[in-house]
């Protein structure tokens, strides 16, 4: 086998799964079983099966901030709100050298929307009256790609897909503030905002910084590591994904869900950074 062919096979032999199926039901296991049946030497990676039910933004966030760490040519299957209440087109998208297979419900559009898709197809083959599109449509499409099949054989090109409005941070008057929201809460209860750290660096200059969390809660400095703050106190830092994050050191767990519970902040709640 030539080096080029071997590299292509290596790149096309990995598929990731992102679903809202959870871990107690057989749905995620069925996807894996069908994939292994179709391609016994496939490598399957679970990004998450714990996406909140029908939560497209969460699925797009998880996949959007993880797919770039996988080799180009990887296949990413996303199954969230697949269309059990109405028929939804199955799509195949090529972006940044990665294949994405999922429903046309907005989730594919929200995966790094600032990057234009290189190819977009509506998958043609369908099982009649399927109640499980991921198993009956997405998996066979992924298996075709895993066997190094051409993507354009799976369907026909389309110029459109459903787009969902994405909440973006806004810049205040005279660039004196940045207003954003909580876009994700991780397993530690850390609040990940949609405010890029690059914005703070660009607009702060030599001014002081104050982060307003509402309810008269404020943070007046940025830390560089979680260990810089005393236990139980909130801190702000720019996380590894490049976003402003609010955390509370050693306050995670079922009984105390970190910064989210301690500060009373949840998804889409407002966070404002002021410069003075």
Each model region followed by its residue ranges:
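A conserved acidic, glycine/proline-rich C-terminal tail/linker
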Residues: 194-264
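N-terminal glycine-/serine-/threonine-rich phosphate-binding loop
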Residues: 7-87
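Active-site histidine-anchored catalytic micro-motif
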Residues: 38-43, 55-58, 71-73, 77-80, ...
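Anionic-ligand-binding alpha/beta catalytic cores of soluble enzymes and soluble regulatory domains
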Residues: 129-205
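Conserved subregion of the PPM/PP2C metallophosphatase catalytic domain
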Residues: 96-108, 112-126, 151, 203, ...
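Structural motif
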Residues: 13-16, 42-45, 74-77, 90-92, ...
